[in-house]
Amino acid sequence: MMKKSLCCALLLTASFSTFAAAKTEQQIADIVNRTITPLMQEQAIPGMAVAVIYQGKPYYFTWGKADIANNHPVTQQTLFELGSVSKTFNGVLGGDAIARGEIKLSDPVTKYWPELTGKQWQGIRLLHLATYTAGGLPLQIPDDVRDKAALLHFYQNWQPQWTPGAKRLYANSSIGLFGALAVKPSGMSYEEAMTRRVLQPLKLAHTWITVPQNEQKDYARGYREGKPVHVSPGQLDAEAYGVKSSVIDMARWVQANMDASHVQEKTLQQGIALAQSRYWRIGDMYQGLGWEMLNWPLKADSIINGSDSKVALAALPAVEVNPPAPAVKASWVHKTGSTGGFGSYVAFVPEKNLGIVMLANKSYPNPVRVEAAWRILEKLQ
C-alpha cells in the first residue's frame, strides 16, 4: 500500500498536464478498471492480467477466466503466451552476448553459420537480422520447415528484395535467426542461455520457453473463435514468439528494462541498454533489439496508428543511426505480441518511471491495445 504522505506529493508531468497529485492505489485501480472492463466486453476477451508500474512500483489487476471449461480464474500466477513480446527477451540476450564480447552486430551472419554459402548472404550482418533489415526476410518461416536441414535450405534459397539496410520488414525469420546465432559462441542452447543469463539473474521464476509439468496448472488457455488453443511448435519459435510468463514476472521485466541500474550482472545491464539503443529510424519510430522506441513526449496517434498491421508489417525505408544512439530515457518503449490465442502489450517511459503490461488470452487488434495502454498511462501522469 502507498503511504498516505505519498498521496499528497506532487510530481511534474510535462507531457500531459502541469502538475498532478500522486495517485492512491484505489485511484490506480479505478483508472485501470474503467479502461480494461469495457475493452474485455467489446473484444470478448475471456481473461486478462494487467500490471501498472507507477513511480517504479508495480500494481496488479486480474479479470475473467484463464480456462473457461474448467472455470479457472486468471490470477497473478497465470501464464500467458507473450507472442512477439518474446523478441524483447531475444534482444536483451543478444545485447548480453555483445557485452560479453562473444558477438558483434557488425559481424557477418556467415561467421556464425558458415553453411550459408549463397551470395545473397554476403554483406548481411547480425545487425540486419536483429532489426529486420536484411533485405526482405519473410514474416513467418514456412510450416513445412521442420528441422535444421530444412531451415538451412530455406535460408539458402531465400532471395532478398532489397540491399541490406534499405528497408525494414518485420519478420520472425529475421530476429529469430539472430537469436539462434547470437548464443552459438556460448555453447548453450537458446533456452539454456536465456534461462541462465536473463531469467535467473532477474529472478523471473515463472517465465518459460518450455512450460514445465508442475507449471501447467497455471498455463492459461488461449481462445480463438471461442475454441481453446496453445501455440504450435515451429523452427525458431523460442527466439521469435515462444516465451510464456505471468503478470508479476512481466512487471519485473519492465522494471529491469526501465531502470537497469539495480541489475547486478554487468553484462546483462549493458545488454538491456543495447536493446534500447537506436539502430534505425523508420518514420518517427526507432528500432532497437526487440524493443521499439519513439521520442517522448508524443501524440497518441503516432503509436496507435503505427501499431496497425498495415504499418507495422509494411516494408518501410530505414535510415541507419550510425553510430547507434544510446538508450534515451525520454522514450515510449514498447512491443506488441500475439499468438493464435493470446494478445500482449508492454510499454514504458523510463523518464517517468511509468509502465504497463497487458496480457490477454485472446488476440485482438494492436491499435486497441495501444490505445488502452495510452489512456491508462495518460491518466497516471
From Swiss-Prot:
Keywords from the named record: Antibiotic resistance, Hydrolase, Plasmid, Signal
Family annotation (SUPFAM superfamilies): beta-lactamase/transpeptidase-like
Enzyme's top EC category: hydrolase
Signal sequence residues: 1-20
Cysteine pairings via disulfide bonds: none
Pfam families reported in the protein's UniProt record: Beta-lactamase
MF terms (GO), sorted A to Z: beta-lactamase activity
Catalytic reaction annotation: a beta-lactam + H2O = a substituted beta-amino acid
Cited function: Class C beta-lactamase which confers resistance to penicillins and cephalosporins.
GO terms for biological process, alphabetical: antibiotic catabolic process; response to antibiotic
Residue numbers annotated as active site: S84 (acyl-ester intermediate)
EC number assigned by the record: 3.5.2.6
UniProt-annotated binding residues for a beta-lactam: S84, Q140, Y170, N172
Transmembrane segments: none
UniProt-recorded name of the protein: Beta-lactamase CMY-4
Gene3D superfamilies: DD-peptidase/beta-lactamase superfamily
CC annotations in GO: outer membrane-bounded periplasmic space
Keyword Signal (UniProt): yes
Classification via InterPro entries: Bact_CellWall_Synth/Modif, Beta-lactam-related, Beta-lactam/transpept-like, Beta-lactam_class-C_AS
Recorded family membership: Belongs to the class-C beta-lactamase family.
Additional facts recorded: The class C beta-lactamase family has a specific amino-acid numbering system known as SANC, for structural alignment-based numbering of class C beta-lactamases, or else the simpler name structural position. A multiple sequence alignment was used to derive a consensus sequence and then the consensus was numbered taking into account insertions and deletions. This allows use of identical numbers, e.g. for active site residues, despite differences in protein length.
